[in-house]
């Protein structure tokens, strides 16, 4: 099965949804759209709380493409301009209620409603939020016809208050009458009159009209709403905080982004933020998150208020706060995140899945490792995963990989739940899940079923990858970390056409991802004959990654000290080379080459001009050795001596440096009989640096971020690098952080002894 997975043939890519699967599109008036959900904005990335299940019949996958309905009966009276007519006559069907739901399924959820659950938890929210469940006395059809007749007869004689009253009354029509009303030319005339009289509206009039528009489902794209937003902007400084939040909430219900209003609202908040109540604060953070628009200065002020109210906030509100900050791409301080983690841990069993995922998102964004939260998540998540939508599962999985947190129970639950519902995944979900498993270097018990289902889904999602090309390299790298190589998909990803598409259609620079994939295929798939990156792009990727790695390593004093000590021990910079043996693996190495007699070779020509090779001699380095250190070197003290014993025991005196014989550490054995302390490399000649090395060592200077959290298990990228180095004949020597970092506090001699043991013991 594994062999089959690694040689999957690329299917002919077809759109997931066919016209027959979708059903016949109906002619819809451009008013007749339930845009009050979240139309006009990007599909939300969060998940909903999935207590019940629903099964969808005869609907297209909304993940592959967003359906467009073109109207055929737009009212001329509502076309204030040709531009608005053309814009408003094309409607996006992205509301969950636009799909037909017959049975229950965990993948069908009303995310808009579930994000707003917190608004039902305190009576204070009713003052400054819109409640769609509010009912009013229904208006009869005959009464509505009478109102519309008056509009036609009196037109410009109607007063502003009468226009507002008519709009509010008409919104009380039964829902099934709304489409008829929106097709009415008299209603279109009433809307035009409202625009003409809008300067006479006060704040409450504006709020009432916006409520009517929400109930009737006025399209978010109509130019009439531009005029209403402008009026709201003019009214900001005359509104109370509750009114401002209510207006922002109504615009959210209309599905319209209101950047001008929010800019002025932010100015207002900078003066009045200290007066925010708890409910106003949480609601404001929700509004900010949904509009993705905020100043960092204001968010810092709001963070201080979160601390003020932290003991009064309930768990759903915690989830709302996290989601708002996450969507606005604003970080919370580690202190606040630890407070949030403590709140969640205190009652995690009662934390809704929606709030849990939102908190997880923020922990991933801030990269705060709350240990107790991680532990409790590992206990509760496996139970929740079967009832989560795949987007929620993706966020949990991505959290684990971002924090390097490998919990086998969580990962196994994810792997077990996905194959049967993989069709619900977006391309983004497939990519992030594969990346997470690959990053954590973990294969679940059902690995073959898990990976085959996701690889097959990649094939089915190819039209979507054309739209979001950044997700395909992510998929393939996650698979490569786990040693899966679907060659037809790789061939497509490295094709000139896809590379060009990736450069044109995404804001991300995918060269390093494609370069990593290209280099990996070159080593691990020797029989691969498909597309490869051009020489130019390979060079670009190599230079880009080397610049990053060199800058990173040269900024670390501990690495520079290690490099200097190795050069000292081996005899000079010509014996050690700091470079990227495998540039596509994104990290650098310290390479050392030994001859058949296990003596270092001066192979680094960048450090030693060729004409000077014949004059190379190992210089006296003046290393003083204690008796203890000599015993370690000459008697082969076990390397475990340096692991976990780098600090002096209580009451034990540190090693004292006395007048001992000074010898270099350049060879495998130290010649202590040489009283001058100098040792030459016998027979060194110009050809010495050209001889074939008996052994090539790739010294890895590691840190804790290359391992799973709290363990010594390498992450996927670094495990793949070791695998590829071995394929190329290198022997990996690891300077692990748990061994080397404590030694940095010890004497220079102890460091040299440790490095000597590492280099030459590994060669045996």
Swiss-Prot record:
Disulfide bonds: none
GO cellular component: mitochondrial nucleoid; ribonucleoprotein granule
Cellular compartments annotated: Mitochondrion matrix, Mitochondrion nucleoid
Taxonomy, superkingdom: Eukaryota
Presence of keyword Acetylation: yes
Keyword Acetylation attached: yes
Biological role stated in the UniProt entry: Plays an important role in the processing of non-canonical mitochondrial mRNA precursors.
Family: Belongs to the FAST kinase family.
Start and end residues of each RAP domain: 697-757
Chief place where the protein resides: mitochondrion
Organism field: Macaca fascicularis (Crab-eating macaque)
Protein name stated in the entry: FAST kinase domain-containing protein 5, mitochondrial
Residue numbers bearing the Phosphoserine modification: 95
BP GO annotations: mitochondrial RNA processing; mRNA processing; regulation of mitochondrial mRNA stability
Quaternary structure and partners: Found in a complex with GRSF1, DDX28, DHX30 and FASTKD2. Associates with the 12S mitochondrial rRNA (12S mt-rRNA).
Keywords on record: Acetylation, Mitochondrion, Mitochondrion nucleoid, mRNA processing, Phosphoprotein, RNA-binding, rRNA-binding, Transit peptide
Residue numbers carrying N6-acetyllysine: 507
Pfam family for this entry, one: FAST_2
